[in-house]
Amino acid sequence: MNPHDLEWLNRIGERKDIMLAVLLLAVVFMMVLPLPPLVLDILIAVNMTISVVLLMIAIYINSPLQFSAFPAVLLVTTLFRLALSVSTTRMILLQADAGQIVYTFGNFVVGGNFIVGIVIFLIITIVQFLVITKGSERVAEVSARFSLDAMPGKQMSIDGDMRAGVIDVNEARERRATIEKESQMFGSMDGAMKFVKGDAIAGLIIIFVNILGGVTIGVTQKGLAAAEALQLYSILTVGDGMVSQVPALLIAITAGIIVTRVSSEDSSDLGSDIGKQVVAQPKAMLIGGVLLLLFGLIPGFPTVTFLILALLVGCGGYMLSRKQSRNDEANQDLQSLLTSGSGAPAARTKAKTSGANKGRLGEQEAFAMTVPLLIDVDSSQQEALEAIALNDELVRVRRALYLDLGVPFPGIHLRFNEGMGEGEYLISLQEVPVARGELKAGYLLVRESVSQLELLGIPYEKGEHLLPDQETFWVSVEYEERLEKSQLEFFSHSQVLTWHLSHVLREYAEDFIGIQETRYLLEQMEGGYGELIKEVQRIVPLQRMTEILQRLVGEDISIRNMRSILEAMVEWGQKEKDVVQLTEYIRSSLKRYICYKYANGNNILPAYLFDQEVEEKIRSGVRQTSAGSYLALDPAVTESLLEQVRKTIGDLSQIQSKPVLIVSMDIRRYVRKLIESEYYGLPVLSYQELTQQINIQPLGRVCL
């Protein structure tokens, strides 16, 4: 074949749309025009080839979505097969000849016996119709329904992963497209299985019509005896039916494989999946070998055959069991190697890479980013911490904090570490510990006062100060029922972790708002507030926007109301270039939320106030530079101010209603920085952040 011919074939292969159109037109002409036997043989061979190729594709695809065009292919192949049946029927009735393949199927395959042919044809048709097609149709129907019902949950899961930073926007878009494609695929398969079902029914009808029509034509028009006509036309009709039903059966098997395929991330072809899952159960093979041996001992059964099978299955199970045991021992040795030592991230990474890169020490190490959020727990607590309950608690905490602050916190990594003290746990941000605590085996954590526990006669042990202004106590689990009856709040080990973690996340929330997260929040709003997003990006650079959001969440102000925040940025962004002051204007635009948050839904706000002289002293200490503003008070003045704050406010943990501190807007941020080391939980508000409906309940005034 010369290069010109190859180029011509390549051009034809590139125009797949034209090839499909030609095929569909050919199907129509096959129903109308009579075809010679040679052409029929070619078309029948093509039909068989298509069915075999489709079956092989179904076996080797990793997921049904890799052959999402199959419903349309099923329609085309069904039409092609029916058109072929019409053409062969025409040739059988007109010329008593439908080509060499039909004749061979009628004589050689069924031995020229009409009864045998009918029986084989009926068996194939019944298997296809009642077994394969019926089951595949039901599976497709259920898959379509479940796929549609699961779409909202999958979409929410994708959104959660994207907020947590597990995936980026592009991957989230791809996953959503995959879910939509999967739903359409199974919905189409639900309808396409009706083609296979109808094809089987049509095959049954066609064969009986052909026999009846052939005998009638043979007797009335060709002068044949009834028995002779029946023998001639029935053999050809059975051959035609077999030629049609064998590819139809292969197509039905293909459809069944595709709709019943359960795909996962580590899926490969069907044979590999079946092989891996079968050999993963060596005990089942050993038991199967014993059962086969017992079958061989039954009188009358072929003993040698069953003994050989029992030997093969049993030996296979034994060898797989030995191999699995060796792998488990190797994994345990590797795990003990990785978990020994201090458990520090650097040491652990070194252990892993030294084993993986043995003999390749000269190669460059792969870049590994730090884990954003990590909980290290003493390995002895692994059984006490129920995995499912802990996972539910962690998901609940992330969800609650997102609804409260609007911060897309990342996924939480839990690691059991043998190098830690008994019951100890560490909470780390970017693999740097920021909080620690202890879990006491057989005890519950209680936050109630000592007097309540003593009143109930419950013995206790004083726990650590997990939070600055909260005392905790350990109570034995045997008093759990008494605590429940007394309606005293207590925490299990899983709840202690999540409770402590929630406070840590709230304290360090601003660390989880970066440029990437800010970009994500803007992209989430583009669909409904496109013009607002364009305007705010024109006025406020992304870096300044990020800093503003960090300052808001750093003081426990939710950023879920992004529309109001962005509107305020547009309003004040051109007038005010100082990020600190711009944040104050944005806070004033959130006054309804702030008042509702700190007044607990009431119109009365318990508050401490600063004397005018104190405010002037702070105002005089503010310094403006090109890099921004800061508070520069004399150390003696700073200590004097803090001492007056301590005298006025005292111990916040002893105050039932949570108060706030109210100062002027221009010094609010500096006052917050001044007192946050000692009064982190005391919100500092400005008068501009109060609505008209709020009534201030003064609790005290800080004076010099």
Curated annotation (Swiss-Prot):
<dbReference type="InterPro" id="IPR001712">
    <property type="entry name" value="T3SS_FHIPEP"/>
</dbReference>
<dbReference type="InterPro" id="IPR042193">
    <property type="entry name" value="FHIPEP_3"/>
</dbReference>
<feature type="transmembrane region" description="Helical">
    <location>
        <begin position="112"/>
        <end position="132"/>
    </location>
</feature>
<dbReference type="Pfam" id="PF00771">
    <property type="entry name" value="FHIPEP"/>
</dbReference>
<feature type="transmembrane region" description="Helical">
    <location>
        <begin position="200"/>
        <end position="220"/>
    </location>
</feature>
<keyword id="KW-0843">Virulence</keyword>
<dbReference type="InterPro" id="IPR042194">
    <property type="entry name" value="FHIPEP_1"/>
</dbReference>
<dbReference type="GO" id="GO:0005886">
    <property type="term" value="C:plasma membrane"/>
</dbReference>
<dbReference type="InterPro" id="IPR025505">
    <property type="entry name" value="FHIPEP_CS"/>
</dbReference>
<dbReference type="InterPro" id="IPR042196">
    <property type="entry name" value="FHIPEP_4"/>
</dbReference>
<keyword id="KW-0813">Transport</keyword>
<keyword id="KW-0653">Protein transport</keyword>
<comment type="similarity">
    <text>Belongs to the FHIPEP (flagella/HR/invasion proteins export pore) family.</text>
</comment>
<feature type="transmembrane region" description="Helical">
    <location>
        <begin position="238"/>
        <end position="258"/>
    </location>
</feature>
<keyword id="KW-1003">Cell membrane</keyword>
<keyword id="KW-0614">Plasmid</keyword>
<keyword id="KW-0812">Transmembrane</keyword>
<feature type="transmembrane region" description="Helical">
    <location>
        <begin position="42"/>
        <end position="62"/>
    </location>
</feature>
<protein>
    <recommendedName>
        <fullName>Low calcium response locus protein D</fullName>
    </recommendedName>
</protein>
<dbReference type="InterPro" id="IPR006302">
    <property type="entry name" value="T3SS_HrcV"/>
</dbReference>
<keyword id="KW-1133">Transmembrane helix</keyword>
<feature type="transmembrane region" description="Helical">
    <location>
        <begin position="20"/>
        <end position="40"/>
    </location>
</feature>
<keyword id="KW-0997">Cell inner membrane</keyword>
<dbReference type="GO" id="GO:0009306">
    <property type="term" value="P:protein secretion"/>
</dbReference>
<feature type="transmembrane region" description="Helical">
    <location>
        <begin position="290"/>
        <end position="310"/>
    </location>
</feature>
<feature type="transmembrane region" description="Helical">
    <location>
        <begin position="67"/>
        <end position="87"/>
    </location>
</feature>
<comment type="function">
    <text>Could be involved in the secretion of the yop virulence proteins.</text>
</comment>
<keyword id="KW-0472">Membrane</keyword>
